[in-house]
């Protein structure tokens, strides 16, 4: 409960840094300026003579006071020296702010406590510095510095406060109670010191709980913004800080502190309120007397100088002990700033040597057994070591080890800094995990089945060879390998081994990666019989200025010039003031086919469905299947006894095929209750139409129907697109309109909309096959402007089938691309808005691609650019294909 309160407090402070900082500073200034608590304005030496104070000062032990000040300065110096070993300038700066502001707050409290008498600070500040503890402040700063984003900074500060807050609160309470015992001693000088100590602890606690976390959050936020959103504070050796700080304090120690606190509270209560005050501690009952400010012995005098001149003269006139203290502080400051920086950097470089180029770790083999990681620097060494490893495996009898340990460590990022010897040591430490030794020869199937079915053992106690043996014997279905293995990756690895033996070239899968992939998001959602994943280059085009916003559009493609061309179109649109877009319609469709005994029956059912009563019945059944699916309309056609019903419904942020299919099935069941003679032939009767060219999608629309437009100034057409408005309009008419009509195209009145649609679909986890209908587009160009030299362009796409949840959008790389566009996941405030926004981005990017390609065609640059940028430089004669090998 207490940790939760501190967590909420930390999150609030980190989320509102400006408010907390301004409020804290304002409160401090008010404490300095207000005069309600101390009614008298007596200042010793200026308007009052304080003979007792002067006598005490003259009789005080100057040597001890000087030593105390020097020790305090050395203590702060060593604390900052320890912070420098962390290697982060941000921790140093934040700790400095913490110290300065804590001193400021403490000075304010002391001034008020002494009735605005600044001479008390001379003895107070050393005790404050001795009680300053930067360890917790630096620990909280390290929590924040281990973050990757500003949101994570706030969350980590909240976690740090939840962990450190209760401990720090208890420690501050215990310190105040322990030090406060000295205020009851009756010794005036000890009472003053203990009073200063208590105020020091309280000031430190106040700053740590308010100003400091807000300052940390604000500093890191400003640092992030100064580098275009990239976190510049994160250090590699902070990666483990959360694990280290998560260790809770010793509960025994905490209980002892609590018991001590209760005991000290009783002591204070008894001494201050229950016991009779004795003459020896009567000074403790009167703060004025205990602090040597007895007004009975003070005499008022007329000031000879102004107050600021009085304070200035006291600051300039320094005693010998003050000169010693100031000299030591300046000497340590110079040493810390100028002479220790190189030494610290040298020490850090020895701890974390960085060499360039960085050695990378490659996985070599694709066999069933674990093998030590091999470090390679070039392909020649890679193949030589691979061949040697294969020969050694043939000659030697090895102990087969399952992939469990490797898979457990494979998901942790391995950062290699330093030389290869250090790397080898780190790899050995990582791989030293408990492993069971398995026999080289496969055991009988019966024994293997018993181990597999044993809940305490399972597949991790079987070698890959034994698993393959069970698959070949039909005891394990090949499609269930991932679910039966201890890790999905091992199941994929075994399937690759099974498949490699059946391929014309056993090493065919060598360059198809499969490691370090989150297959849990794939199984049962995206793919079956997985043997790896296909890396595709992802480029970015942008910024695309659309509806007053800028988007960096990810495009996954292997076609050269595509991203560059689209990027040029985005630049032209941006220079023209940006594009505007609107969503005309939003509705996914599913078109089942049902059959009736006679054609007249089909016609009658069609007529009934067109009535408000019939539509209401079907809509209620359809809408009951989902909180997002809402039937909009029915479009029907009769072909003999067959009735084709096209259901159109919104689907939120999902593309919606599964959602609409579920609603369609429920609606057909309801329709069958009214017409029992109806026969459901198929939930999909190709009347949708999905993944096939269809005029109904072009005319009626499917998914999101979007229109996008822009005006490109004549200067941009000439200087960026390298052509003229007249030439582009002429090419557009004769190519995109007349040419497509001559070819009998359906929805293909564009230059290459499918290129952009498919590239974005692959990058953002969409169904790539739906580029067939989604690429329906008509591109229109007109002359505009006062002189008709500007270019007006529009793209209308009536059937963009797209979504931001479900399917491939659940995969992390695809989610990253969606996050680039700000449309990842479902929109909570307005369901479906993310998908509609993505459709507008697709249409706007298509228009950019159309603009650039049409300009290249008009200027005659297309062939030349592709010859330069889209031609492979590999000598194909040096590559032997499968047919060549067979012929040889």
Swiss-Prot record:
Pathway where it operates: Metabolic intermediate biosynthesis; (R)-mevalonate biosynthesis; (R)-mevalonate from acetyl-CoA: step 3/3
Residue pairs linked by disulfide bridges in the UniProt entry: none
Residue numbers on the Cytoplasmic membrane side: 1-9, 79-89, 150-159, 221-248, 340-888
A Pfam family it matches: HMG-CoA_red
EC code(s) of this entry: 1.1.1.34
Keyword Cell inner membrane: no
Cellular compartments per GO CC: endoplasmic reticulum; endoplasmic reticulum membrane; peroxisomal membrane
Protein name: 3-hydroxy-3-methylglutaryl-coenzyme A reductase
């Amino acid at each position: 409960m207490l940790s939760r309160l501190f967590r909420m407090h930390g999150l609030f402070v980190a989320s509102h840094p400006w408010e907390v900082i301004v409020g804290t500073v304002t409160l401090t200034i008010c404490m300095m300026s207000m005069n309600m608590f101390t009614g008298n304005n007596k200042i010793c030496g200026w308007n009052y003579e304080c003979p007792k104070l002067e006598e005490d000062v003259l009789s005080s032990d100057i040597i001890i006071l000087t030593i105390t000040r020097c020790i305090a300065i050395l203590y702060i110096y060593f604390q900052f020296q320890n912070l420098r070993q962390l290697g982060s300038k941000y921790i140093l700066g934040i700790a400095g702010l913490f110290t300065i502001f804590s001193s400021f707050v403490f000075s304010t409290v002391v001034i008020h406590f002494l009735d605005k008498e600044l001479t008390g600070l001379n003895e107070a500040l050393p005790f404050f510095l001795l009680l300053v503890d930067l360890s917790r402040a630096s620990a909280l700063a390290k929590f924040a510095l281990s973050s990757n984003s500003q949101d994570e900074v706030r969350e980590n500060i909240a976690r740090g406060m939840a962990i450190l807050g209760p401990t720090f609160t208890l420690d501050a309470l215990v310190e105040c109670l322990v030090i406060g015992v000295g205020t009851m001693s009756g010794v005036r000088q000890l009472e003053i010191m203990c009073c200063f100590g208590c105020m020091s602890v309280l000031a430190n606690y106040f700053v740590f709980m308010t100003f400091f976390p807000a300052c940390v959050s604000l500093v890191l936020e400003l640092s992030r913004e100064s580098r275009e959103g990239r976190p510049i504070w994160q250090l590699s050796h902070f990666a483990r800080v959360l694990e280290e700080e998560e260790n809770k304090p010793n509960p025994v120690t905490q209980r002892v502190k609590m018991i001590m606190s209760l005991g000290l509270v009783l002591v204070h209560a008894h001494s201050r309120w229950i016991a009779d005050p004795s003459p020896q501690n009567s000074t403790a009952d009167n703060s004025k007397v205990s602090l040597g400010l007895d007004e009975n012995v003070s005499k008022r005098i007329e000031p000879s100088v102004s107050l600021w001149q009085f304070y200035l003269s006291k600051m300039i006139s320094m005693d010998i002990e003050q000169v010693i203290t100031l000299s030591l502080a300046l000497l340590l400051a110079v040493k810390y700033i100028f002479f220790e920086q190189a030494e610290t950097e040298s020490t850090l470089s020895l701890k974390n040597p960085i060499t360039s180029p960085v050695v990378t770790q490659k996985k070599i083999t694709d066999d069933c057994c674990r093998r030590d990681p091999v470090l390679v620097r070039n392909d020649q060494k890679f193949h030589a070591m691979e061949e040697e490893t294969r020969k050694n495996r043939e000659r030697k009898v090895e102990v087969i080890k399952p992939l469990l340990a490797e898979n457990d460590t494979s998901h942790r990022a391995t950062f290699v800094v330093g030389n290869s010897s250090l790397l080898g040591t780190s790899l050995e430490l990582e791989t030293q995990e408990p492993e069971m030794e398995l026999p080289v020869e496969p055991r009988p199937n019966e024994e293997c089945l018993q181990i597999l079915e044993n809940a305490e053992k399972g597949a991790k106690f079987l070698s890959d060879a034994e698993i393959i043996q069970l698959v070949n014997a039909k005891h394990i279905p090949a499609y269930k390998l991932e679910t039966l293995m201890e890790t999905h990756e091992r199941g994929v690895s075994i399937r690759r081994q099974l498949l490699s033996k059946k391929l014309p070239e056993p090493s065919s899968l060598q360059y198809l990666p499969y490691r370090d992939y989150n297959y849990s998001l794939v199984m049962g959602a995206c793919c079956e019989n997985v043997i790896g994943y296909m890396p595709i280059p992802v480029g970015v085009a942008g910024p695309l200025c659309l509806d007053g916003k800028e988007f960096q559009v990810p495009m996954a493609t292997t076609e050269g010039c595509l991203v560059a061309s689209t990027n040029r179109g985005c630049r032209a649109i941006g220079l023209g003031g940006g594009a505007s877009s609107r969503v005309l319609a939003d509705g996914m469709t599913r078109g089942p086919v049902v059959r009736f005994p006679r054609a007249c029956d089909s016609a009658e059912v069609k007529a009934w469905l067109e009535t408000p009563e019939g539509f209401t019945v079907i809509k209620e059944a359809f809408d009951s299947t989902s909180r997002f699916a809402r039937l909009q309309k029915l479009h029907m056609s009769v072909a003999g006894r067959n009735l084709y019903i096209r259901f159109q419904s919104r689907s939120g942020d999902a593309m919606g095929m599964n959602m609409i299919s579920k609603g369609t099935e429920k609606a057909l069941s309801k329709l069958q209750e009214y017409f029992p003679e109806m026969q459901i032939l198929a939930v999909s009767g190709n009347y949708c139409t999905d993944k096939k060219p269809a005029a109904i999608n072009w005319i009626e629309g499917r998914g999101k129907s979007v229109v996008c437009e822009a005006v490109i100034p004549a200067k941009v057409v000439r200087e960026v697109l390298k052509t003229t408005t007249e030439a582009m309009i002429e090419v557009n008419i004769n190519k995109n309109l007349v040419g497509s009509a001559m070819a009998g195209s359906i929805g293909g009145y564009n230059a290459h909309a499918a290129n952009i649609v498919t590239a974005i679909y692959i990058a953002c986890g969409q169904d790539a096959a739906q580029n067939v209908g989604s690429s329906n587009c008509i591109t229109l160009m007109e002359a505009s402007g006062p002189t008709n030299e500007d270019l007006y362009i529009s793209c209308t796409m009536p059937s963009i089938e797209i979504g931001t949840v479900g399917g491939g959008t659940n995969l992390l790389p695809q989610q990253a691309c969606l996050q680039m566009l700000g449309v990842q996941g479902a929109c909570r405030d307005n369901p479906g808005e993310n998908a509609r926004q993505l459709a507008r981005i697709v249409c706007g990017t298509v228009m950019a691609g159309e603009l650039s390609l049409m300009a290249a065609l008009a200027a005659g640059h297309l062939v030349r650019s592709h010859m330069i940028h889209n031609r492979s430089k590999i000598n194909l004669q040096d590559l032997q294909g499968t047919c060549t090998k067979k012929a040889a």
